[in-house]
């Protein structure tokens, strides 16, 4: 009797465990999910956020997956710019959020009060400045100045964070032992807030790029304005995707916001590559056959990793870039490339078969848009469509590289794709007429046929430029073809 009772109890417990495994995840309100009755499910948390966009409050409600929750980006508010809440019960994000209202204006001051308020601090600052100058003329100040360590290096913070390790060591340790999604949030903030900006090295759609120094190491700092918070947030989110790190994808270091009470800067810190973008590199340099193959192979390797889904508990979703061009690819010291600027990227959830398209009004670069994007025939409900559009753009980048390859002393001057067919800043209509209606593609010079490497590269380009996206090569196929070419040409990629 006792044995039968124990057996029945064991079966009941197994049934309860099975039911728990099959139970649906957390249900949340999702304002972006009109196809699923504005509802989504997740194993992470429900998310509600209100942000200031063009002077108006914009509300977003959605699900946060466990990897995204662990990245600690979603549940973070910034002063007067966003208010964000994460919660963990069904439909708990069905709430109304508002940005904090400014405190009521203080009563107006009269002329006498204003004069006192202005005069007193100015006098005090003047006295303090005079005392400082007088003190620094003395021997004691001179001695300290000589013996003082470099003020640009906040050594205590450096020692606290890295303990003798380089940034690459820190990132490798976290990638090898943790989630693979980047440094902990506290370390990111410590790094970002102890960086000394050196010089501006570029400007883009979303802000400026600076060369910075942290503990004697070079870093790149992409600075967004507060009105582009959505772009900063999206790019930081993509860069912190689990298992994204790859030698041919720009190495992400930190994301942080700098708020001094009057304005907010949003920082994205990454590895610094002094050679600059591929566009700048090709304008300055001629490449050898081996150099061309190294550049092309590294781009294909980075894109293949981006496009590939890694299945597992520490897996990576497939990602499409959506803005591949020579200005968004950086050249490293070793003459290989790293794909950058992931702010427009999309992620594919193969389990739910959904595409995480960013709510961003900015699109890719018109000159590099695939035919199906120009004539609006692209099926945005199929993730493969985005990968195929990337391949078309890569073909154009390869054309830019191959033109600068010197064979027998013959080399073409650097030009952008379609330079002889459209103006310097073409419209979508102008690109559609050339690419879709007239079906033109960049010309491939006849002299490329005399060089095996250029002949293979020309064939790859043509197979990337097919009007039918399904007929184009995959990034992995391109990588394998160029790898074989690398072996034939005996180049060390």
UniProtKB/Swiss-Prot annotation:
Protein's UniProt keywords contain Lipid metabolism? no
What ranges are annotated Cytoplasmic (topological domains)?
135-493
GO MF terms here are: activin receptor activity; activin receptor activity, type I; ATP binding; growth factor binding; metal ion binding; nodal binding; protein serine/threonine kinase activity
Catalytic-site annotation from UniProt = 323
Q: What is the effect of changing residue 267 to R?
A: In a lung squamous cell carcinoma sample; somatic mutation
What biological processes does GO assign it? activin receptor signaling pathway; apoptotic nuclear changes; apoptotic signaling pathway; cell differentiation; cellular response to growth factor stimulus; insulin secretion; lipid storage; negative regulation of chorionic trophoblast cell proliferation
Record's superkingdom?
A: Eukaryota
**Topology of the protein relative to the lipid bilayer:** Single-pass type I membrane protein
- Report domain Protein kinase positions: 195-485
Annotated ranges, domain GS = 165-194
Q: Where in the cell is it found?
A: Membrane
**Which residue ranges does UniProt annotate as crossing the membrane?**
114-134
Name the keywords, alphabetized: Apoptosis, ATP-binding, Kinase, Magnesium, Manganese, Membrane, Metal-binding, Nucleotide-binding, Receptor, Serine/threonine-protein kinase, Signal, Transferase, Transmembrane, Transmembrane helix
The UniProt annotation places ATP binding at: 201-209, 222
* Residue numbers on the Extracellular membrane side: 22-113
What's the catalysed reaction?
L-threonyl-[receptor-protein] + ATP = O-phospho-L-threonyl-[receptor-protein] + ADP + H(+); L-seryl-[receptor-protein] + ATP = O-phospho-L-seryl-[receptor-protein] + ADP + H(+)
Extent of the signal sequence: 1-20
Q: What cellular-component terms does GO give this entry?
A: activin receptor complex; plasma membrane
Q: How does it assemble?
A: Binds the type 2 receptor protein ACVR2A.
Q: Tell me the function of this protein.
A: Serine/threonine protein kinase which forms a receptor complex on ligand binding. The receptor complex consists of 2 type II and 2 type I transmembrane serine/threonine kinases. Type II receptors phosphorylate and activate type I receptors which autophosphorylate, then bind and activate SMAD transcriptional regulators, SMAD2 and SMAD3. Receptor for activin AB, activin B, activin E and NODAL.
Q: What is this protein called?
A: Activin receptor type-1C
